[in-house]
């Protein structure tokens, strides 16, 4: 049976994709057949092949399997806004059955599947359904990405607590340095490590340019999962 993990973040723009690429690289190095999955993405660009989302493309590149774009990202929207808003505006409902079918298809091909969410934990997919609902439905172990900056401790603890209250496994967390480390960086890391009830899988240093394309798998200790 495939190993499956869901990557969420303490907020949008905290480095979920950077961490997801690092995790995929580490899993590939460990000998797994890996697949990244971004079931819903907004903020995509028009290309000759159709809409393409940069996060989904990064997952596609960092998967060890050769996957079609639509397999990695079945729901793609142009406007960078909450999926439930643009989905309703375009008359394209996001269906959990389609999301789950995509996951099943990847599980048939890969033995290590990483699913990346959109935004934070409770990102709405419709007026009545959130990403959290789908993850709970699928019973996916969760990896939390924390963008290390002022305010991250509270956001990390709130997210970790609600994940556990949903009855899900918080499998681990990844620290992502979204800015050059400040003078309190070490204290933030010490506090987060003490308070988050899951192992620290690794810390990805601040990378000024194209972090999704960097060799970041070396920062991840996959043995802790």
Curated annotation (Swiss-Prot):
GO biological process entries: biotin biosynthetic process
Residue positions binding substrate: 42, 188
Gene Ontology cellular-component terms listed: cytosol
Residues at the catalytic site: 38
Pathway: Cofactor biosynthesis; biotin biosynthesis; biotin from 7,8-diaminononanoate: step 1/2
GO molecular function ontology, one term from the record: magnesium ion binding
Cellular location(s): Cytoplasm
Positions with a binding annotation for Mg(2+) 1: 13
Enzymatic reactions: (7R,8S)-7,8-diammoniononanoate + CO2 + ATP = (4R,5S)-dethiobiotin + ADP + phosphate + 3 H(+)
Lipoprotein as UniProt keyword: no
SUPFAM superfamilies in alphabetical order: P-loop containing nucleoside triphosphate hydrolases
Entries under Gene3D superfamilies matching the protein: P-loop containing nucleotide triphosphate hydrolases
Cofactor note: Binds 1 Mg(2+) per subunit, in one structure a second Mg(2+) was seen.
Listed CDD domains: DTBS (cd03109)
InterPro entries: DTB_synth_BioD, P-loop_NTPase
Complex formation: Homodimer.
Family: Belongs to the dethiobiotin synthetase family.
Protein name, UniProt field: ATP-dependent dethiobiotin synthetase BioD 1
